[in-house]
Structure formats: C-alpha cells, structure tokens
C-alpha cells in the first residue's frame, strides 16, 4: 500500500509541475515547489490519518509517537554536525572514486536550486517548506510509520537499515545518496532509542536549516 501511495504522490506532484508549466525547468519558483510539496505530501498524510483511525487508537499524536522533550534539543548539534561533518566524510570516498558523479556541484545541486529560486519574501516560504514541513512529514513517514512497522516484523536493526535506504533512495539523486543514507541512519537510531519522533525531527530540522544557512553564507 505504501509503495502505491508513493507512486500516486509522485505522479500527482509531477502533474502539478507540468500543469503549472515548469516541467523540465532548471530553476523552479518557490511557490511552485510549495504547491508541489503540498500535493506530494497529502497522500502520505492521508494514509497516516487512515491508518491511525483504522488500525490505531485514533489519536494521531499517540499512534505515531509525535511527542517532544527538552532532551530533544540535543538534536540541534547532532543535525549541524551531520550536515557539516558526517555527510562530507561519508561522501568523500565516493568523490575520490567517482568524481564525475559525486562532485561537490552534483551533491549540492538540489540545495543550490532551491535557494536560487527563492527571492525576497519567498525565502520565508522556502524556510517553512524545507526547515519545518519536510522534516515533520518525512519523520512521520520514514521513522514513525515505515521504520516502526519494519521493526515489528524484522527487528530494530533491519528496520533502521531498510528505512534509511528507502529514505535516501526516494530523493532520486545518486550524488546525495551516501550522505542521505548516513544521515538517515542517525535519524533511525534516534527514533529507535527514544521511541519518539521528537529527537529525530529536531535533528532533521537542524540538518536542513544548516544547509540553508551554508547556502546563504556562501553566496
């Protein structure tokens, strides 16, 4: 069911971009990205809501462990270190072995494109999408739903590995895969250890925020 949801969501997202006339464009406006993201995420949230009502308690927050504690603030330095150090260290061997694929330009292309498309007040919308919405939705999907259910079936370690691989793969950028997989392992371990989404969400927020700050400072 989840694979079908993913397929439908991506088809809908692609249709929206095409209808708006930005298919194949090098730089897509931030408002188009926002609309596309909303369409892309809606089927996932819909399935989570349905799952909570059909197979859970009906309490969305409880069913998907969406709670926070003060200790989750450790996710801030963890996310920053993951962005500035972990991703770089993990990607470096691939850059040495396959420089034409894993060069810095390719690894940073998505972040650069997003930042280049945002001007003036649109930067605020970009921050909302990348720093707030994306981490919450992705942690609900990949940790609270996919990893949790895989853990029930195959155990925590296998669940972390598979959900992390899936997380990195669905971003559809081979140059980003090593770094995203390593970061997803961090997020998966956070969720497995705490049994809550708080730490993984805060870590993810800090990770994405750091990427935007780096983009801004290097312009």
Per-segment meaning from a language model:
Residues 1-70, 209-219:
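N-terminal, membrane-interfacial amphipathic/helix-forming hydrophobic leader that caps
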Residues 6, 33-36, 40, 45, ...:
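Small-residue-enriched transmembrane alpha-helices
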Residues 20-34, 58-134, 152:
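Juxtamembrane helix-loop-helix connectors linking adjacent transmembrane helices
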Residues 46, 96, 138-139:
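A generic alpha-helix propensity feature with a strong bias for hydrophobic helices
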Residues 86-90, 105-219:
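Transmembrane helix-loop-helix hairpins at the membrane interface
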């Amino acid at each position: 069911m989840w694979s079908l949801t993913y397929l439908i969501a991506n088809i809908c997202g692609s249709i929206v971009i095409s209808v708006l006339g930005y298919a194949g464009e090098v730089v897509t406006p931030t408002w188009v990205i926002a609309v596309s993201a909303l369409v892309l995420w809606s089927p996932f949230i819909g399935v989570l809501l349905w799952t909570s009502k059909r197979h859970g308690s009906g309490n969305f927050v409880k069913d998907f462990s969406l709670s926070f504690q003060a200790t989750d603030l450790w996710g801030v330095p963890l996310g920053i270190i993951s962005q500035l150090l972990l991703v770089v260290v993990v990607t470096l061997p691939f850059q040495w072995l396959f420089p034409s694929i894993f060069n810095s330009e390719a690894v940073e292309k998505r972040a650069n494109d997003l930042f280049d498309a945002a001007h003036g007040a649109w930067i605020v919308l970009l921050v909302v999408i990348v720093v707030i919405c994306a981490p919450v939705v992705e942690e609900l999907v990949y940790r609270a739903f996919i990893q949790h259910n895989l853990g029930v079936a195959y155990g925590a370690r296998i669940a972390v590995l598979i959900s992390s691989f899936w997380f990195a793969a669905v971003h559809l950028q081979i140059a980003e895969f090593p770094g995203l997989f390593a970061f997803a392992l961090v997020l998966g371990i956070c969720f497995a250890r705490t049994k809550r989404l708080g730490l993984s969400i805060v870590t993810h927020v800090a990770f994405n925020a750091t990427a935007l700050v780096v983009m801004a400072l290097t312009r």
